[in-house]
């Protein structure tokens, strides 16, 4: 997201800006107790599913980290609020799986309820993996 974006003052963007995916324990207060991370990727069916709570989210990133041997990186590109509950984030992920360097676009739709992150849908461009 650019610094001059008119959406910068949106409260959900401010909340999302506090999220540190490298320190989920430190960011735990941002999440509702029943938070759910939804992940679907036909290229990684063994990872697909719902991950519940902060522990579930930590497990998801642990699995991705192991599959990529620690090469997984997320570079946010833009964030756009949609109404009162949703923020759509476009990110570019880089990783290495089986010796293949991969860059892919991802959309994560974050849902906020009562000032907490309630749900997120991680939608990778699974069919453009071979670049």
Residue map of PLM features:
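Short, low-complexity N-terminal intrinsically disordered segments enriched in polar/charged residues
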Residues: 1-33, 131
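A short, structure-level motif marking secondary-structure boundaries and short turns
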Residues: 8-9, 46, 92
